[in-house]
């Protein structure tokens, strides 16, 4: 869980990289804010989350350890870029807001990830499937590596 948490972190570098990518891609200047965003305003862009990862994010949220999500504000839309497990866990816990890094585009630009979400029929958190019968790929990889190291010892 510790390894996964480090990889899943919304580090300032990760946020800055995504911010600069948007600026270059669309030829705009964005602003960055750290704020709470209403869960009902968030537009997810991912169609599934893994139950084991959801359990980890729920644990972190209950203890105040969860990293902020990454959200893009474009026009009057709040697009969830990173933090689907955290946001679903927040919603399940009854939280009305999600701690987020918000990249504000300052104008209405339809993002590619919005188009992809539209094509997949993802509009709200109700459209996200929780996968119970499989592990998050990162957890499966971590456990495979641990098993290999155990066999070598």
PLM regions with names:
Residues 1-29:
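N-terminal leader/domain-start detector
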Residues 2, 17, 53-56, 112, ...:
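Exposed alpha-helical structural elements
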Residues 3-4, 30, 59, 67, ...:
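Polar low-complexity intrinsically disordered regions enriched in Ser/Thr and small residues
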Residues 7, 11, 26, 62, ...:
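Generic secondary-structure transition motif, activating predominantly at the C-termini of alpha-helices
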Residues 8-15, 35, 106, 131-134:
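Intrinsic-disorder-associated interaction segments
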Residues 18-81, 85, 91:
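Short alpha-helix boundary/capping and kink motifs at helix termini
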Residues 75-153:
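Basic- and aromatic-enriched surface patches that contact anionic nucleotides/nucleic acids
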């Amino acid at each position: 869980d510790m390894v996964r948490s480090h990889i899943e972190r919304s580090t300032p570098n990760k946020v800055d990289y995504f911010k600069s990518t948007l600026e270059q891609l669309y030829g705009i200047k964005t602003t960055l804010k750290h704020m709470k965003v209403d869960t009902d305003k968030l537009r997810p862009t991912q169609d599934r989350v893994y139950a084991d990862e959801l359990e980890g994010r729920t644990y972190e949220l209950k203890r105040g350890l969860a990293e902020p999500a990454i959200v893009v504000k474009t026009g009057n839309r709040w697009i969830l870029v990173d933090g689907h497990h955290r946001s679903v866990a927040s919603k399940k816990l009854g939280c009305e807001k999600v701690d987020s890094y918000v990249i504000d585009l300052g104008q209405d630009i339809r993002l590619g990830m919005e188009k992809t979400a539209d094509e997949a029929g993802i509009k709200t958190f109700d459209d996200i499937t929780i996968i119970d019968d499989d592990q998050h790929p990162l957890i499966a990889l971590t456990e495979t590596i641990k098993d290999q190291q155990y066999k070598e010892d």
